[in-house]
Curated annotation (Swiss-Prot):
PANTHER family: G PATCH AND KOW-CONTAINING, G-PATCH DOMAIN AND KOW MOTIFS-CONTAINING PROTEIN. GO terms for biological process: mRNA splicing, via spliceosome. Belongs to the SPP2 family. Residues 112-143 are annotated as: Disordered. It is found in: Cytoplasm; Nucleus. Belongs to the CWC complex (or CEF1-associated complex), a spliceosome sub-complex reminiscent of a late-stage spliceosome composed of the U2, U5 and U6 snRNAs and at least BUD13, BUD31, BRR2, CDC40, CEF1, CLF1, CUS1, CWC2, CWC15, CWC21, CWC22, CWC23, CWC24, CWC25, CWC27, ECM2, HSH155, IST3, ISY1, LEA1, MSL1, NTC20, PRP8, PRP9, PRP11, PRP19, PRP21, PRP22, PRP45, PRP46, SLU7, SMB1, SMD1, SMD2, SMD3, SMX2, SMX3, SNT309, SNU114, SPP2, SYF1, SYF2, RSE1 and YJU2. Interacts with PRP2. Residues 121-134 have a biased composition (Basic and acidic residues). This is Pre-mRNA-splicing factor SPP2. One of its GO terms (cellular component) is cytoplasm. Changing L109 to E/R: Loss of the interaction with PRP2. Residues 100-149 form the G-patch domain. The lineage of its organism: Eukaryota, Fungi, Dikarya, Ascomycota, Saccharomycotina. It holds the Pfam family G-patch_2.
Length: 185
């Protein structure tokens, strides 16, 4: 049996550790992914229904008065089982899947991405004309290099009005140097 001490303020708390707790610690440090080890196979994976807490009052730090209060928090079975038993995803039946037409799904996707179509032409029955019109505008709305929702920056297409050419000046003489004269000499 080994001892350890914990100093809180001016009082010291001494605790004895038995061999049983050492075995628990060795089980906790064991590799859970090593199935050859017999100790890890004996670990149970049941959900905890109780959490035990030992409370030590500041007045009970002496060894003589070893009255530790045991607090037990019981988890409600209803809340615990409801969380584990409830399905996470509701599945769509084949009947519900077949009820949604693909055309409406695609239009909904485009509307979600900010695509605006002429609702007046769609209601008249000229769907083919409006779709052809929308497809022809794709190259204007989405130039190369931009994503679906990206907006074209107007400053990119504007050419600068002023042009300043690069002039080479000889450091020694301080005169302008033409490329033709420098290459000939």
């Amino acid at each position: 049996m080994s001892k350890f001490s914990l100093k809180l303020g001016s009082k010291t708390l001494k605790k004895n550790i038995s061999k049983k707790t050492k075995k628990k610690n060795s089980l906790q440090k064991a590799n859970l992914f090593d199935w050859d080890d017999a100790e890890t196979a004996s670990l149970s994976h049941k959900p905890q229904s109780k959490i035990k807490i030992q409370s030590i009052d500041k007045f009970d730090l002496d060894e003589e008065s070893s009255s530790k209060k045991k607090l037990v928090i019981k988890l409600s079975e209803n809340a615990d089982t409801k969380k584990n038993d409830a399905p996470l995803v509701e599945y769509v039946t084949e009947k519900e899947y077949n009820e949604v037409p693909v055309e409406e799904f695609g239009d909904a996707l485009l509307r979600g991405m900010g695509w605006e179509s002429d609702s007046e032409q769609d209601s008249k029955g000229d769907k083919t004309q409006s779709r052809n019109k929308d497809v022809s505008n794709v190259s204007q709305i989405h130039p190369d290099g931009l994503g679906i929702g990206a907006k074209l920056n107007k400053a990119i297409n504007v050419e600068e009005a002023s042009f300043m050419p690069v002039v080479k000046i000889d450091k020694i003489t301080g005169t302008k140097v033409d490329d033709d004269k420098k290459n000939k000499s």
